[in-house]
Amino acid sequence: MTTETFVKDVKPGLKNLSVLFIVLETGRVTKTKDGHEVRTCKVADKTGSINISVWDDLGNFIQPGDIIRLTKGYASLFKGCLTLYTGRGGDLQKIGEFCMVYSEVPNFSEPNPEYIAQQSQNKQAQAESGTGTNSHNSSSPAPPASDLENGNGSNSSGPPTHQSTAPTHSTSGRITRSQPNHSIPGAPNSVSNGKEPRRTGKR
């Protein structure tokens, strides 16, 4: 038999939960595209309250004041809010009414900034791993990642990276023509790079 979990100990991703709670409120029924009925109920124990999402006929039988034991449940985030669900083979069993010590606060289903930040980081990590170039940059230290967020990595790094990025952004034909001119000692004025003549003109 699994040990009972208090509402305060429920965390996203936990599975096979056994929770004893009292029903405080039963929410409105919403229908999914598949035709299932979903009802969100506010439940509580002595450590706090949380929302539970109940599907189909089970939701019709739940009433405020019912004391219920959830077995084989799991916890997940829904729109940034911690929510309990009945898992596969999970069960809601009414074991009494009204007589239970509970606390409505803290409400663990209120939007939690930590969970929202964690979800956004996970989404960014998935987006970066989806493309080949971003996955290489995501493995480098934090400052290059922030440079990527700013747009160009060359803006924050100064002229050395600007010079190194200029050949990669220009066409390869121009690079091969300008490189031999750099190797000739007497030809600094004949450089074909568009940016360098402007610099020499400013001096």
UniProtKB/Swiss-Prot annotation:
Compartments in which it is found: Nucleus
InterPro entries: NA-bd_OB-fold, SOSS-B
Keywords: DNA damage, DNA repair, DNA-binding, Nucleus
Keyword match Glycoprotein: no
Biased composition (Polar residues): 117-128, 149-182
Regions annotated as coiled coil: none
Listed Low complexity bias regions: 129-140
Claim: DNA damage is one of the keywords in the record: yes
Residue ranges of DNA binding: 22-92
Annotated GO biological process: DNA damage response; DNA repair; double-strand break repair via homologous recombination; mitotic G2/M transition checkpoint; response to ionizing radiation
Predominant place of localization: nucleus
CC per GO annotation: nucleus; SOSS complex
GO molecular function: single-stranded DNA binding
Region of interest called Disordered, as start-end residue ranges on this chain: 111-203
Function (record text): Component of the SOSS complex, a multiprotein complex that functions downstream of the MRN complex to promote DNA repair and G2/M checkpoint. In the SOSS complex, acts as a sensor of single-stranded DNA that binds to single-stranded DNA. The SOSS complex associates with DNA lesions and influences diverse endpoints in the cellular DNA damage response including cell-cycle checkpoint activation, recombinational repair and maintenance of genomic stability. Required for efficient homologous recombination-dependent repair of double-strand breaks (DSBs).
Annotated family: Belongs to the SOSS-B family. SOSS-B1 subfamily.
Subunit composition and interactions: Component of the SOSS complex, composed of soss-b (soss-b1/nabp2 or soss-b2/nabp1), soss-a/ints3 and soss-c/inip. SOSS complexes containing soss-b1/nabp2 are more abundant than complexes containing soss-b2/nabp1.
Name under which the protein is recorded: SOSS complex subunit B1
Gene (UniProt): nabp2
